[in-house]
Amino acid sequence: MAKSDYYDILGISKNASDREIKTAYKRLAVKFHPDRNPGNLEAESKFKEIKEAYEVLLDPKKRAAYNQYGHTAFDQGSSNTEFTSNADFSDIFGDVFGDIFGNNRRKRSNRGSDLQYNINLSLEEAVKGISKEITIPKLERCNICSGKGMQPGTSAQNCSTCNGQGQIQMRQGFFSVQQTCPSCRGKCKIIRFPCRNCSGQGRVERSKNISIRIPAGVDNGDKIRLSGEGEAGKLGGSSGDLYVKISVKEHPIFKREEHNLYCEVPINFAMAALGGDIEVPALDGRVKLRIPAETQTGRLFRMRGKGVKSIRSGHQGDLLCRVVVETPVRLSEKQKSLLKELGISFVGRTGMYNSPRSKSFFDGVKKFFDGLTN
């Protein structure tokens, strides 16, 4: 399969300056770095391709050879000429990966995996906060070898293949390039007597109970990070983190939108027409709500400070009650008679006055049909 053009890989022109090459490399390296894409083989392959293009184009001699001969400049047997790249990657990797991934790449490669635990909360628990205890299976540091991976009383020895350097020199066309040592895999040392308890990995699988304090005001999708509670790292590497993801169950009464709570409050016909006081639910108890006379369905009443407290700002949200005027059902004969009498009183001009929205609607309907017949 033909290799891609190095300039195309970095997205730069053939006249790009060293600064433009570095800028393009930093941007792409951060995006496709294996530490940001764990287990993604396509991203890992792309990262190697980007690094190769950068190494060639930043070195004046390699770039000149590539511009003249293309990829054939690096094929085995092309020439007896040999030189080693002096390109300094320390500044690039320090700038790009120092802040994002940490400074010690060897320890980073041994870092334990992050874990995620999904926890379900009721709305009350999410709003008020609560302590929970969870049990998770994970890789913990071996207590026999203290995470070192070797039998107690023994020590690791320098790798004889790379002389403890972690890398070996390989010939590639014009150049000598460094590759990770296949014997020690870049670790510089070889464990001759691995720990029997953890098979030389420095960690074993076991379940752990962890207490979590859920702060008041969390919402769906929020994550709580517990530093160092992920899986133990390989051979003494640092532990990963545990992320607790919040899922809030649906509530039978309240709906939540950010820091506000919403609920529907049914009221009867008489209460809507004449007004009065009712009690409505809130998460901290019942609250009195005054219904004005002539209240219509859909009217919102705001009860300040009865919502959810923001974790970040401390602002307290509101409770919004939407009134629904309920049509009476299962009427007695007396109630039907009274309602008929009331309905008769709405006929004529008095009815138009009592039901202005009905009058406006039917006036509009009349104009609509009059327009069709004209």
Curated annotation (Swiss-Prot):
SMART domains: DnaJ. It is found in: Cytoplasm. Its main location: cytoplasm. GO terms for cellular component: cytoplasm. Keywords: Chaperone, Cytoplasm, DNA replication, Metal-binding, Repeat, Stress response, Zinc, Zinc-finger. Participates actively in the response to hyperosmotic and heat shock by preventing the aggregation of stress-denatured proteins and by disaggregating proteins, also in an autonomous, DnaK-independent fashion. Unfolded proteins bind initially to DnaJ; upon interaction with the DnaJ-bound protein, DnaK hydrolyzes its bound ATP, resulting in the formation of a stable complex. GrpE releases ADP from DnaK; ATP binding to DnaK triggers the release of the substrate protein, thus completing the reaction cycle. Homodimer. This is Chaperone protein DnaJ.
